[in-house]
Amino acid sequence: MNKQLKEKLALLPDQPGCYLMKDRQQTVIYVGKAKVLKNRVRSYFTGSHDAKTQRLVTEIEDFEYIVTSSNLEALILEMNLIKKHDPKYNVMLKDDKTYPFIKLTHERHPRLIVTRNVKKDKGRYFGPYPNVQAARETKKLLDRLYPLRKCSKLPDRVCLYYHLGQCLAPCVKDISEETNRELVESITRFLRGGYNEVKKELEEKMHEAAENLEFERAKELRDQIAHIESTMEKQKMTMNDLVDRDVFAYAYDKGWMCVQVFFIRQGKLIERDVSMFPLYQEADEEFLTFIGQFYSKNNHFLPKEILVPDSIDQSMIEQLLETNVHQPKKGPKKELLMLAHKNAKIALKEKFSLIERDEERSIGAVQKLGEALNIYTPHRIEAFDNSNIQGTNPVSAMIVFIDGKPYKKEYRKYKIKTVTGPDDYGSMREVVRRRYTRVLRENLPLPDLIIIDGGKGQINAARDVIENELGLDIPIAGLAKDEKHRTSNLLIGDPLEVAYLERNSQEFYLLQRIQDEVHRFAISFHRQIRGKSAFQSVLDDIPGIGEKRKKMLLKHFGSVKKMKEASLEDIKKAGVPAAAAQLLYDKLQK
């Protein structure tokens, strides 16, 4: 911990508020809230933590805090700060999942539409529905039952819906407000759970039509009843009061939290939302933050009632959301809460089981790879790849896999310094020499296996440096590719021989992941260097633009393409003197 952090920790107040953790670049990486700032912020730097929290702590170089007058104010501020900074460790709602609704528009001649965007307008929203297909099926049923206008713009003549009996044709006929109001009330009653009453009314009309020998009309009514049954009675009833409510419950273990949300609409459990994310503060406070973000960030429709566990501050949620919040002690509502909690525990258990299986597969693949190469299990693998285009901007990259998983913290990039032109052998010698000279000098861990993404020449070049220059005894293998640039074989030994691996084995898949990753890392670095080089060359020989200003322009525009799209004024605003800006602008336009 640096001196500045220690001094700031000593000055933390005994008050509620929010804290913003920052990395070396002063980027906000995590936002949290606390009832007592001093206790919460200090807890990150004392005691032991799980792996995920420890990873966060290792990146913290600075922090700031904002004192609030209450816990509720801290919760609201935390939500706003997360929305503003989008910190990488506040990941609970990154996917922004939204659900579809059926909207009854507030127009002279109302329409029914399916939408995911709930606005504060005068329209009536019904939902959410589990998916867009369910919403469209329900709308299609309502279109059959109630002849509302379908067209977004009123046409000059009647459309097909009028001839099908699904529209009253307000485009050419004078439809009274009373008629529209009756249709709106009927649809509202239907969507609020009164479809059984509608079905009963239709059955009475069907029997009446049959008695009057109006068989076509009776058949039409029978079909409408069948559509209601097939569309609306797929869900099992869970409540009898038909109140729209959301049920929130959570479980946490091993540094992870799972929140389950049950959507109850018109007495039915129509859908659930599952969110899983790392836990960096107290579970009940993280849960409060989640609920606040759930409705503000994801544009979810606020129901009439919300159910939460009794461990949560009920009044704070009520003040935040301005809706009814209940903590049931018994009965059907309590059973719903317990069911949501049970599902959260199951989801966490499944996640940990999958992690364990993945680790077993990864470790098993590493062990099998060692057996295939006749070496000790290569727990630590370091892989190298070169990248250049006809010898220009040559670079190399090294990646690290530990127990079959990428360890990106130890990835390294290299600009080739001693080689000119397209010399992959010389480049490999330089990079391997630089890497392991430093490893020996700084007493860093040596790999159990070195993998070279290249042909025999590069493998032998790396071996020569490792064995003859540095006197190390590390197994070196090479990845051979087929004509489609896919992993085909593994080369090892002196002289090099093919180590045969089953194409569908876990160890072969591990090699593919290593080859793909080191190639991706090297290529992305080369593109970055090439882009900077192109940028620099455009700026060469322009009076008034030196190295410092070149770096400033690169940071401002990012690429030559964006700089070419810029106006003269844009270039001046980037801090370039008028004369130099004119010269640069003229050069870019050629």
Swiss-Prot record:
The UniProt record lists the UVR domain at 196-231
Keyword flag DNA repair: yes
User: Where are its TM segments located?
Assistant: none
Q: SUPFAM superfamilies attached here?
A: C-terminal UvrC-binding domain of UvrB, GIY-YIG endonuclease, RuvA domain 2-like
- The answer to whether keyword Cytoplasm applies is yes
InterPro entries, alphabetized: GIY-YIG_endonuc, GIY-YIG_endonuc_sf, GIY-YIG_UvrC_Cho, RuvA_2-like, UVR_dom, UVR_dom_sf, UvrABC_protein_C, UvrC
User: What are the GIY-YIG domain coordinates in residue numbering?
Assistant: 14-91
What is a single cellular component term in the Gene Ontology annotation? excinuclease repair complex
Q: Which CDD domains match?
A: GIY-YIG_UvrC_Cho
Q: Which domain of life is it from?
A: Bacteria
Family annotation (Gene3D superfamilies): 5' to 3' exonuclease, C-terminal subdomain (1.10.150.20), GIY-YIG endonuclease (3.40.1440.10), UVR domain (4.10.860.10), UvrC, RNAse H endonuclease domain (3.30.420.340)
Q: Name one GO biological process term.
A: nucleotide-excision repair
GO MF entries? DNA binding; excinuclease ABC activity
Q: Which PROSITE patterns match?
A: GIY_YIG, UVR, UVRC
Write out the entry's keywords from A to Z.
Cytoplasm, DNA damage, DNA excision, DNA repair, Excision nuclease, SOS response
Q: Where in the cell is it found?
A: Cytoplasm
Q: Which family does it belong to?
A: Belongs to the UvrC family.
Entries under HAMAP family matching the protein: UvrC (MF_00203)
Q: What does this protein do?
A: The UvrABC repair system catalyzes the recognition and processing of DNA lesions. UvrC both incises the 5' and 3' sides of the lesion. The N-terminal half is responsible for the 3' incision and the C-terminal half is responsible for the 5' incision.
Could you give the subunit structure recorded for this chain? Answer: Interacts with UvrB in an incision complex.
What name is this protein filed under?
UvrABC system protein C
